[in-house]
């Protein structure tokens, strides 16, 4: 393999040297020097692009002498640099090898994952701090947005009314986070003990998300909420009196934001606040887009003129009049849509009043939030990519449990992303130690939810795993399978529940399971279908129909037709005496007489003997 690659690099080096010397290459020359197994057009285009990037033009046919003379300034003075040619050849050879290696998604994923370097403890802390910084910037932006404070206060009121848990609103305080040196010093011992527990508790299905959180001190939360509410009321009062740009209003708004950022909010509430700000910014931009459309598309105002004059005039209701007074060729058209533009500006003014901010402040706050989110997302991405190998190592332990390996990796990656979001480096643990629990939880829960054809609830999966573990222990202890009574006593559960769990734990069997050595028959062939008529009944009914037709053929046509209509033989339904009478244009009584006469004939031994065998005689 190494010799092949060396020869390949040598060929490509000669090709590049030739191209640098003569200033061009043909597609035929490039194709002759590429590996035979390289057939992907996109990969070939990439290679030709790299050759073009070296200043070597690739032509269908060799250019004539005049063309070369015209391009002499670009091509004739090149010097063949062996080192450059070798480097380029190595790069192209690597590209070829990469292209022809494999298209297996698992191998491609592993190869790409292996290019990311592992993090040191210091690297983990650095990334965790960047995540914190990004999230802090997001919360600072939310704190500067008055409606965020209003929503936080309303959510706390719902908590006081018993409609929210405290941890659904506030989970802690950002200004009370301290370094715990004692925890940091015991990292190694704690990590080892956690890994040991991890190995022992392999069948458990964790549910840390549903576990009750300890949460912050309710009295401290109430005190801070009271301070926030007081400052916010003061802000609203000053805003109503002086407007958004007064120094006193800005000062109080900053005080409100300073208290707001001390709260460590729950993730759902943070997402709600972010969505609220984004919706408000979208509303502002929507009104601006409508004005832009009216001015540039309807009134045909030049876009540059609009942008130049519109800046800082979004809420200036005199802007349209000022633009019309410029007496441009689009002024009359602008006058026709003046009311529409003014209506959009008035809507923007209303948004300012609702938000207690200027439009410029709203946009700046949104810019701060987007920047913080991008910063945190980038750091989270780095942390996730650096720990993908941890997911692989854990997922390997859960193969052959009902999910494919790639599915296990995907579920483990979801757990890894949750771990990144919840990781607190100040507690002193290594990230891999903390993430292991989240990855295991995600994988085991996915196996419980998806591995079985018939889904079993997670709590029942836990019971089944416990039952299997105790059954194995008792099998080793007694040398035989444990009875339901013994399992019930060991697990401290009723015997009927043990039997129910054992019944649920059974795996479904495919109806296509072959039976016997020849495998011509399947399990489904031996299962009775109560909805299908048995072959015996089918044969009996067919014979009965044929016999009845033969017997009726011995009657007169009129008698046979009356019986057929009265009993629905070979018809969709039976008929009443009156319906049959109308058919024959006789009275009901006459039809009854014909029917009675025909039945007497059928009771004659010569005819009844043929039908008597079909009667069910007990």
From Swiss-Prot:
Q: Which PROSITE patterns match?
A: SIGMA70_1, SIGMA70_2
Q: Where is this region: Sigma-70 factor domain-4?
A: 551-604
List the keywords (alphabetical).
Cytoplasm, DNA-binding, Sigma factor, Transcription, Transcription regulation
Q: Name one GO molecular function term.
A: DNA binding
Pfam families found in the cross-reference section: Sigma70_ner, Sigma70_r1_1, Sigma70_r1_2, Sigma70_r2, Sigma70_r3, Sigma70_r4
Motif Interaction with polymerase core subunit RpoC at which residues?
A: 407-410
**What is any one of the record's Gene Ontology cellular component terms?**
cytoplasm
Give the protein's recorded name: RNA polymerase sigma factor RpoD
Species lineage = Bacteria, Pseudomonadati, Pseudomonadota, Gammaproteobacteria, Lysobacterales
């Amino acid at each position: 393999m190494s010799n092949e690659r060396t020869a390949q690099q040598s060929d490509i080096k000669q090709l590049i040297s030739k191209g640098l010397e003569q200033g061009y290459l043909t597609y035929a020359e490039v194709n002759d020097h590429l590996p035979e197994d390289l057939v992907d057009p996109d990969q070939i285009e990439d290679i030709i692009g790299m050759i073009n990037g070296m200043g070597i033009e690739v032509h269908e046919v060799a250019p004539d002498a005049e063309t070369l003379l015209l391009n002499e300034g670009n091509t004739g003075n090149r010097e063949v640099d062996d080192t450059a040619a070798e480097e380029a050849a190595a790069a192209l050879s690597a590209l070829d090898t990469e292209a022809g290696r494999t298209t297996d998604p698992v191998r491609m994923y592993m190869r790409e994952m292996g290019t990311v370097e592992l993090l040191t403890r210091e690297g983990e802390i650095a990334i965790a701090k960047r995540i914190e910084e990004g999230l802090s910037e997001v919360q600072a932006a939310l704190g500067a947005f008055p409606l965020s404070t209003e929503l936080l206060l309303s959510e706390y009121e719902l908590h006081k009314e018993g409609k929210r848990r405290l941890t659904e609103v506030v989970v802690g305080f950002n200004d009370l986070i301290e370094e715990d040196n004692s925890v940091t010093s015991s990292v190694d011992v704690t990590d080892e003990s956690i890994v040991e527990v991890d190995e022992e508790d392999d069948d458990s299905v964790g549910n840390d998300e549903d576990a009750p959180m300890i949460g912050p001190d309710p009295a401290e939360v109430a005190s801070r909420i009271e301070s926030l509410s007081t400052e916010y009321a003061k802000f609203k009062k000053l805003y109503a009196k002086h407007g958004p740009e007064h120094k006193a209003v800005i000062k109080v708004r900053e005080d409100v934001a300073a208290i707001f950022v001390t709260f460590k909010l729950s993730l759902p509430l943070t997402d709600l606040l972010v969505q609220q700000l984004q919706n408000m910014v979208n509303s502002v931009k929507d009104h601006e887009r409508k004005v832009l459309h009216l001015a540039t598309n309807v009134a045909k105002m030049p876009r540059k003129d609009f942008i130049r004059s519109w800046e800082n005039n979004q809420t200036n209701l005199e802007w349209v009049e000022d633009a019309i007074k410029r007496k441009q060729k689009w002024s009359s058209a602008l006058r026709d849509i003046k009311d529409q533009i003014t209506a959009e500006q008035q809507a923007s003014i209303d948004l300012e009043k609702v938000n207690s901010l200027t439009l410029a402040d709203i946009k700046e706050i949104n810019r701060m939030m987007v920047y913080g989110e991008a910063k945190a997302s980038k750091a989270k991405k780095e942390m996730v990519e650096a720990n993908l190998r941890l997911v692989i190592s854990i997922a390997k332990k859960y193969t052959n449990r009902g999910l494919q390996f790639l599915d296990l990796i995907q579920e483990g990656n979801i757990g890894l992303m949750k771990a990144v979001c919840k990781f607190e480096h100040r507690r002193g643990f290594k990230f891999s130690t903390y993430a292991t629990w989240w990855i295991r939880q995600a994988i085991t829960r996915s196996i419980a939810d998806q591995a079985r054809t018939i889904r079993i609830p997670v709590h029942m999966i836990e019971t089944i795993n416990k039952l299997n573990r105790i059954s194995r222990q008792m099998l080793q202890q007694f040398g035989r399978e444990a009875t339901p009574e013994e399992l019930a006593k060991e697990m401290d559960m009723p015997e009927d529940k043990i039997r129910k769990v054992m019944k649920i734990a059974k795996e479904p069997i495919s109806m296509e399971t072959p039976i016997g050595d020849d495998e011509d028959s399947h399990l489904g062939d031996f299962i009775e279908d109560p909805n299908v008529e048995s072959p015996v009944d089918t044969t009996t009914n067919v014979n009965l129909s044929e016999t009845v037709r033969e017997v009726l053929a011995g009657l007169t046509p009129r008698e046979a037709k009356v019986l057929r209509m009265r009993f629905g033989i070979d018809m969709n339904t039976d008929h009443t005496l009156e319906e049959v009478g109308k058919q024959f244009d006789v009275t009901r009584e006459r039809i009854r007489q014909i029917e009675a006469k025909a039945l007497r004939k059928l009771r004659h031994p010569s005819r009844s003997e043929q039908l008597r065998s079909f009667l069910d005689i007990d």
